Design a protein with these regions (language model features):
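Conserved beta-strand/loop scaffold segments within soluble protein domains that form the structured core
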Residues: 1-114, 125-132
Length: 132
């Protein structure tokens, strides 16, 4: 089993390059990659993850997720999920998203008397699952 979890908070002119490769060689193997990031100011994230499933790796379960929240128009994200699947008897999925701040959520917090800075911080922490 392979689990990769990452949470990145990028601000100012931070640059982060995330790269991983998971190679499934035997039957019944499992992997789950879950990477989230928030980006502000002129920060940049590059995410590249490759999952390789050999022909002999039947009954493999491989999941790949990358979610990114842009908190400014000048922040940038490049996300490249790659699946190299060489057998049919598997369960694999991937998904990548890049989204902006939900203005309705921001407005709802501000209507409760929370200033813009704190409202954005709350949304960022909720996105990263830092608040329960």
């Amino acid at each position: 089993h392979t689990l990769v979890n990452g949470k990145y908070i990028l601000e100012e002119d931070n640059i982060n390059n995330v790269a991983c490769q998971i190679h499934h060689k035997g039957p019944g193997s499992y992997s789950n990659v879950d990477v989230k990031s928030t980006l502000e100011d002129k920060s940049h994230l590059s995410f590249l993850c490759e999952i390789i499933v050999d022909k002999s790796a039947i009954d493999t379960d491989a999941q790949l997720t990358n979610k990114n929240l842009q908190l400014s128009k000048t922040a940038t994200v490049v996300t490249e999920p790659q699946l190299d699947i060489n057998t049919k008897e598997i369960s694999c999925s991937h998904g990548c998203t890049v989204s902006n701040v939900d203005k309705e959520q921001l407005y709802a917090l501000q209507s409760k008397g929370i200033n813009d800075t704190d409202a954005r911080r709350i949304l960022k922490e909720c996105f990263l699952d830092l608040i329960i």
